[in-house]
UniProtKB/Swiss-Prot annotation:
Family: Belongs to the YqgF nuclease family.
Name the UniProt record assigns to this protein: Putative pre-16S rRNA nuclease
Taxonomic path: Bacteria, Pseudomonadati, Pseudomonadota, Gammaproteobacteria, Vibrionales
Single GO MF annotation: nuclease activity
Species of origin: Vibrio cholerae serotype O1 (strain ATCC 39315 / El Tor Inaba N16961)
Function: Could be a nuclease involved in processing of the 5'-end of pre-16S rRNA.
Alphabetized SMART domains for the sequence: YqgFc
Amino acid sequence: MSRTVMAFDYGTKSIGSAIGQEITGTASPLKAFKANDGIPNWDEIEKQIKEWQPNLLIVGLPTDLHGKDLDTITPRAKKFAQRLHGRFGLPVELHDERLSTTEARAELFAMGGYKALSKGNVDCQSAVIILESWFESQWG
């Protein structure tokens, strides 16, 4: 059975999201949620989850290039993941997001130049990269 999976690129000002199907291993950008010091409008996230009905949620885990936790943002991303699970009762996994923002910017710039590099676009494309990376990790 193929699962529908939703991913989030957590940030303190914006949280990008993407949706994908495990059977194809591909993802598409959804919406960037504005956050106030890392706290999103949970009603908006709930609306998106109800609309897409994912079986699993993935949250990008920010680390340094060596895979070590970053002092401020890593614990907050973990807390966001815990809150997603607590609010919606869906399984949540953390997945390495190293260099996803850099890759997202490069992809968006190649597609649309500087105009494509809005914060929301970058965050959602980062969520796509996180999700597709998670799919690849499942195929081992």
